Every structure is written in structure tokens, then in C-alpha cells.
């Protein structure tokens, strides 16, 4: 038997020794998520990402992240049944600049509108905005009782349903086709499209609870940083007013950030 040290035993140390536990959060950084200038509250939250290591760049991990935010949080409002999807398109410093990616109604709102003794009318249409975004809009509306109606049901005839659906599609196409994405989002915030449909269909059959219930982003044009900065009120004068109001809040957030970095 050869005399000497058993290298395997000394190399590995004690068998079954505990590994040193590394806190995964020590390798991560917090980034602020910024909403476009269309919304009143710009600073919507923070997101976590692993720090840049070698070829793995932190900003690449952030781009394409989708955040779903209630409209009440974006507008500092009480009405909270609309949810907006915002997608990160660029990272500037510690800020993730987002753009509109979709809209939806909350499940409880949708369920509260569906009732007996009325007709539910749905329509959807694919439309392209003037700046090249292809959107799919879904609309929903419900028939209601006419004034002085005694009968408890208010069902529309199939012919009327088809007419109303045609009107819905016409109005949605018209409102989106003639505007860019920023103007479309400005219409979705108060849901002026739903109100227009309600007025237009009054002559066919009285409607209530008419909403654009969902907006899907199907296709986007090539990414341009200038346009994104304009959306965030960096290049346009119109966005400056809302940008300045929340500017103070953003500075406070940035002032709070450095101590965390020093500790890391």
C-alpha cells in the first residue's frame, strides 16, 4: 500500500459540510418603473433584476417586461375596474420607460354587468393607428328597458343586434384609424369610445354598460427612442405639465436609492 495523504479527503473537506448560503438578493438591483405622460401618476412601482455580469446585461432582462396596473393607481382615481398593461421598452439609468401594451376590464366588473332579461352584444375589430400599431379592440354592450316599459325582458331582435354590432365596429375603427397610439390611450382612459357607441345605437335599441372591454397589441412598428421619449414628456411640450407635477416625487425616489447601492 502506497504511503501518502489521501488527496480526495483533504480536498473536499468534511463530508456533508453545509454549503455557504448566498443571499440571491445581494446580486440584484431595484429599478423604478415609469408610466408614459398620458397618466397622472408616473412612478408606478419598482422592479427587481440581476446585476450586469459578463455578457448578461441587466437592461436586456428588463426590456419586454409587462406590468399590469389598475387605472385607479395611474390616475389617482376611485374608479378601479380598468387595468392597463405597460411594457418596458427602454432603460435610462435606474428608470424603466414603459409604453402601452394592452387594456382589460376586471373580472368582477365584467361579471357584475352580465344579467338576465337583457341581450349582451359583443364585437371585435383589428385596427391600425396612424403611427403603425395594430390593435385588436373588443367591445361589449347590454340592452336596457325603454322608458315606460312594463315588460320585464328587454331582448333585441337578431336584426337589431347585427345593426348594433356593425355600428360598434364602425365607431371603433373610425376612432383608432384617425389617431396615433397616444390619442387612442387618451380616449381609453375615460372610455369615450363606449359613450359614443351608446349614443349612436340609441336609435336602434337603448343600451347601457357599453365598454371597450379589452385592447390587445398585435403588431408594433420598429422601436424608436425619440418617440418613446416624447411619450414620456421628454421631447414634447404638451407632456411637460404632467411631467413636472410628478418630477418632485421622482427626485425623492432617486434620492432614496443611493444608500441601498452603497450597502451592496
Swiss-Prot record:
The modification Phosphoserine is found at residues 237, 263. The protein designated S3b has the same amino acid sequence as S3a except that it lacks the C-terminal 12 residues. It is probable that S3a is converted by proteolysis, either physiologically or fortuitously, to S3b. The keyword Acetylation applies. Residues 242-255 have a biased composition (Basic and acidic residues). The modification Phosphotyrosine is found at residue 256. Residues 232-264 are annotated as: Disordered. There is a cross-link at residues 34, 249 (Glycyl lysine isopeptide (Lys-Gly) (interchain with G-Cter in SUMO2)). GO terms for biological process: cell differentiation; negative regulation of apoptotic process; positive regulation of fibroblast proliferation; positive regulation of translation; response to ethanol; ribosomal small subunit biogenesis; translation. The modification ADP-ribosyltyrosine is found at residue 155. It is found in: Cytoplasm; Nucleus; Nucleus, Nucleolus. Belongs to the eukaryotic ribosomal protein eS1 family. This is Small ribosomal subunit protein eS1. It comes from Rattus norvegicus (Rat). The gene is Rps3a.
